[in-house]
């Protein structure tokens, strides 16, 4: 006997229903996380490369590590400025894709490479010519200036290829393809480690080069990164469609806009990096132990900061695409989703660091005097992770939206005019020491985040009003 069973009509209909489509908020959230993940890995790779140099050189010789650190300090200013000045490549590429004009991205890339050439070779010349004089003028002791001069010159030689690698990485990120850049950054880290192990202690034949060997390892790794990225871009199947091989017509407004975005980002980077570096001076007025403790806090914060940097780049791409597509609602949605996500991530980092602060501090030092300063400073640092993360993401979102100078002015006010004087007042006259420096960073981070979020909201209101008037 055959038994025929039938499914109820409602159940059958339910079983055949297609998957519910995602709403725009969930779609943007998934896209943000997809873009941010590889970018975070890429930015972490930059930090690991510098950390590798320091570890290998430090194990070889503490004296050589001092030379390496002094040579790296002035070169890092040029590196940071270069990254900021070339942000326009990422933003303009995303805008072209959002406008449905992928061929224009090739013109953005070519302009970026020319600009990178000028920046790279100009920075190399300035650093090589004036860097040694700067070291001598600082009145450094124990032969630091003399020992750091040659590594500094070698570091300067890698600035042109580094600028090229930044352009290629930003261009791929603007195309919403951050994965290759992240993968190649970590391959460059492998090259850097191998070159360090070969050149610094002088194994397998070459003489031990110490700090100079670490600088040459950085040169080799940066060159390998630039070459790998260039080969990848040239061999992309879409390269011709994207205009990579086509000489673009001269477009002065686009050239100016691309550089203008970079000017604002470069100035912001300068203000922020200089302000945080300037805290070392105030800590030096407190005590040598305060300098060491602040260095630990800054190092931990810098590692955590790579996540907001990655989310900021992803946000710039998404807001830039919406800007190119003339989609104000898309810009608003992408921005506020990113602000919420990074705010939560910042809070989570603080909640994670607070109970583990002892282990983190012990990874750096076991000195009781240093630990007495590091532990409360790490507790205070937990309070600025969220606002600091929000401000960097909001600044990038505003630049992608066409607001170039508001973030720069905000960073000038917050970091140059508020943080430094407040840190000095709290640390020295008020007697709060290192904790006063950390409190000033907390206040400044909330101030910058508040300014930038308010400006983003003002643009939301402006665009909504314009849409209502047009209707």
From Swiss-Prot:
Recorded GO cellular component terms are: plasma membrane
Per its record, what are the GO molecular function terms?
Answer: antiporter activity; xenobiotic transmembrane transporter activity
**TM segments?**
38-58, 69-89, 114-134, 152-172, 197-217, 266-286, 289-309, 334-354, 370-390, 409-429, 434-454
Record-linked InterPro entries: MATE_fam (IPR002528), MATE_MdtK (IPR050222), MdtK-like (IPR048279)
Report how it sits in the membrane: Multi-pass membrane protein
Q: Which GO terms describe its biological process?
A: monoatomic ion transport
> Which cell locations does it reside in?
Cell inner membrane
Q: Which Pfam families does the UniProt entry name for this protein?
A: MatE
Q: What UniProt keywords apply to this chain's record, in alphabetical order?
A: Antiport, Cell inner membrane, Cell membrane, Ion transport, Membrane, Transmembrane, Transmembrane helix, Transport
Q: Where is the signal peptide?
A: none
The task this protein performs is described as:
Multidrug efflux pump.
Family to which this protein belongs:
Belongs to the multi antimicrobial extrusion (MATE) (TC 2.A.66.1) family.
What protein name is recorded for this chain? Answer: Probable multidrug resistance protein NorM
Organism, by scientific name, is Caulobacter vibrioides (strain ATCC 19089 / CIP 103742 / CB 15) (Caulobacter crescentus)
Q: What is the lineage of its organism?
A: Bacteria, Pseudomonadati, Pseudomonadota, Alphaproteobacteria, Caulobacterales
């Amino acid at each position: 006997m055959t038994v025929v069973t039938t499914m109820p009509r409602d159940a059958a209909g339910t079983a055949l229903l297609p998957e519910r489509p995602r709403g725009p908020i969930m779609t943007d959230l998934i896209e943000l996380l997809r873009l941010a993940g590889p970018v975070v890995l890429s930015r972490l790779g930059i930090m690991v490369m510098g950390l590798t140099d320091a570890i290998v050189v430090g194990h070889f010789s503490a004296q050589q590590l001092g030379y390496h650190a002094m040579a790296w300090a002035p070169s890092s200013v040029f590196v940071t400025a270069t990254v900021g000045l070339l942000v326009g490549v990422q933003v303009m590429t995303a805008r072209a894709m959002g406008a449905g004009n992928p061929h224009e991205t090739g013109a953005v890339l070519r302009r970026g490479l020319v600009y990178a050439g000028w920046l790279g070779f100009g920075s190399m010349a300035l650093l090589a010519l004036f860097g040694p004089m700067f070291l001598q003028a600082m009145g450094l002791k124990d032969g630091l200036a003399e020992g750091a001069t040659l590594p500094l010159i070698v570091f300067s030689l890698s600035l042109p290829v580094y600028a090229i690698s930044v352009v290629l990485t930003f261009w791929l990120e603007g195309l919403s393809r951050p994965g290759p850049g992240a993968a190649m950054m970590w391959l460059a880290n492998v090259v850097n480690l191998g070159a360090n192990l070969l050149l610094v202690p002088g194994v397998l034949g070459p003489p031990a080069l110490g700090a100079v060997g670490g600088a040459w390892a950085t040169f080799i790794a940066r060159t390998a990164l630039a070459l790998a990225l260039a080969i990848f871009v040239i061999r992309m199947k879409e390269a011709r469609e994207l205009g990579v091989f086509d000489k673009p017509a001269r477009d002065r407004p686009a050239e100016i806009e691309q550089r203008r975005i970079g000017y604002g980002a470069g100035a912001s980077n300068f203000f922020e990096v200089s302000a945080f570096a300037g805290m070392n001076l105030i800590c030096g007025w407190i005590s040598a132990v305060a300098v060491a403790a602040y260095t630990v806090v800054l190092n931990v914060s810098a590692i955590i900061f790579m996540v907001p940097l990655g989310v900021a780049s992803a946000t710039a791409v998404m807001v830039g695409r919406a800007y190119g597509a003339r989609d104000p609602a898309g810009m608003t949605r992408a921005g506020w989703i990113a602000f919420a996500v990074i705010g939560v991530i910042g809070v989570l980092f603080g909640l994670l660091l607070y109970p583990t602060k002892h282990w983190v501090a012990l990874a750096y030092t076991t000195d009781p005097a240093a630990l007495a300063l590091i532990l409360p400073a790490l507790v205070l640092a937990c309070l600025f992770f969220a606002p600091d993360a929000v401000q960097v993401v909001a600044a990038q979102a505003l630049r992608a939206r066409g607001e170039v100078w508001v973030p720069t002015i905000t960073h000038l006010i917050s970091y140059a005019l508020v943080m430094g004087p407040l840190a000095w007042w709290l640390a020295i006259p008020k007697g709060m020491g290192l904790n006063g420096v950390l409190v000033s960073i907390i206040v400044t981070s909330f101030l910058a985040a508040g300014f930038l979020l308010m400006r983003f909201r003002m643009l939301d209101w402006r665009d909504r009003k314009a849409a209502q008037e047009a209707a």
